[in-house]
Design a protein with these regions (language model features):
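Feature primarily recognizes SF3-like P-loop helicase cores of small DNA viruses
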Residues: 1-38, 64-438
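Modules that initiate DNA replication and primer synthesis
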Residues: 1-2, 38-66
Length: 438
């Protein structure tokens, strides 16, 4: 005969003296600590929960006196029940507002609403329209960058505050080392919290699991970029200009598709290069800023980051100013002559066919002349030898010319005739001035 257990009035509603009603507990828990669950990720009003251990600890504190065995398993089961009860459709990707610690900033009209709503990302900084000008931050940037490049940085950092890839750019800040450029990344991590992550561009391109780490992120910071040339660039280019869902993989999980809007901010001692991709598309996606040389008599301040982080509210206003300017310019960045030259220099250094085509004394452009692909490639190899350069392959050389035929007023043809009536490939519009020995 079962023994009835008299109910203790001090017991919570979800406990009957023998077991915990997980559904009832979950509902009571959600009333006290509101949560939503989107794609198996829990969200609080502060944004996504990166570590569920705190929630598990809260569950434990509530049930530990009612469970005598299997406590850890019970906590895990209740957490899964809470996720089911908190199910929500994905949050909208809001490109016109920014969720901040004390409310929502509306980008179209610059108004601020003091309310906290569930959202994909919440930045851990308060909006204060009367915040002081971030003098230490601005002084640091003036010491680090050319004045003409600071508006570009301002626009890009503002761009990173919203989940949008309309700018279709990634930013690289390049120096010789020791300038303090990576301090920018540390300040941004404090400004953006978990919406910014540290990572590696090389890893994103080459590791199929690394791209999933960009999910829900506004920014990925690579504070010591690997200088090895990328073997491929497909994923980097796709992420920078992403307009559709990307296929992501996690270990032990079936691949799935998500919207990715993370931007890249990279710091290094050289630019990002590719072994095989030397197209305009690869370089067009890059904003490259170069730092000033570190003054020989400068004494580094070990508390510089802390001093700049004390100005976060002012830095936020500064970033918003850049974002408004970018939006008004239809997401076209302000690019100084120096920054534009940086991209051109990097492009030339990775593709010496450009310099060859602008050289003198080896050939000249003449509409009524033609040259075979082999003869033109031999002239190019002679130029490389004279200039101590490595030559590209014959296939790539011809491909570069065909891709840029309009730029050089050339016409690719299959009707170049050699002695003996042999018909070969070549180009119309080139007169050779040298004839290297075969």
């Amino acid at each position: 005969m079962k023994k009835n257990i008299s109910r203790n009035p001090l017991w919570p509603d979800w406990y009957n003296g023998k077991k915990i009603d997980e559904v009832q507990f979950g509902r009571a828990f959600l009333e006290q600590w509101p949560l939503k669950c989107v794609n198996s990720t829990l969200y609080t009003l502060d944004g996504p929960v990166e570590d569920e251990s705190e929630i598990k600890q809260r569950i434990l504190e509530n049930i530990e006196e009612y469970v005598t065995s299997g406590l850890s398993k019970k906590v895990t089961n209740i957490l899964e029940t809470i996720k089911l009860l908190a199910f929500s459709d994905p949050f909208p990707i809001e490109q016109d507002c920014i969720h901040l610690q004390n409310g929502v900033y509306h980008l179209p009209d610059g108004t601020f609403q003091e309310s906290r709503l569930f959202c994909q990302n919440r930045l851990p900084v308060k909006y204060d329209p009367k915040a002081a000008t971030p003098d230490r931050w601005l002084a640091f940037l003036h010491e680090l960058l050319d004045d003409a490049d600071i508006p570009t940085l301002q626009e890009y950092l503002g761009y990173c505050l919203i989940p949008s890839t309309k700018g279709q750019k990634m930013m690289l800040i390049v120096g010789k080392g020791g300038e303090g450029k990576s301090r920018i990344g540390l300040v941004l991590k404090r400004l953006m919290g978990d919406a910014a992550s540290n990572g590696s561009v090389q890893k994103v391109e080459n590791n199929r699991f690394a791209r999933a780490d960009l999910e829900r992120r506004l920014l990925m910071i690579d504070d010591d970029m690997d200088m090895n040339a990328l073997p491929k660039t497909n994923y980097i280019k796709t992420i920078v200009t992403a307009e559709a869902k990307l296929d992501l993989e996690r270990k032990g999980v079936q691949s799935y598709q998500r919207d990715i809007y993370a931007r890249f901010l990279c710091f290094g001692n050289g630019a990002l290069t590719s072994l095989y991709d030397h197209s305009d598309g690869f370089f067009r996606r890059q904003l490259i800023l170069t730092t000033k040389d570190k003054p020989a008599d400068r004494t580094d301040d070990p508390f510089l980051v802390e001093k700049m982080c004390a100005e976060l509210e002012g830095i936020l206003l500064w970033c918003l100013e850049g974002l408004h300017r970018l939006v008004q310019n239809d997401f076209r960045f302000t690019v100084s002559e120096r920054a534009a030259a940086n991209v051109d220099t990097i492009k030339r250094s990775s593709n010496n066919v450009i310099d060859f085509m602008e050289s003198e004394g080896y050939f000249r452009f003449k509409a009524d002349y033609s040259i075979s692909s082999k003869e033109f490639y031999d002239i190019y190899k002679q130029w490389c030898e004279d200039n101590a350069c490595h030559s590209v392959s014959a296939i790539r050389f011809s491909a570069e010319l065909r891709q840029n035929d309009r730029r050089y007023n050339l016409e690719a043809t299959n009707n170049i005739y050699l002695p003996g009536g042999r018909r070969v490939r070549g180009f119309v519009g080139i007169e050779p001035l040298v004839h290297p020995c075969p």
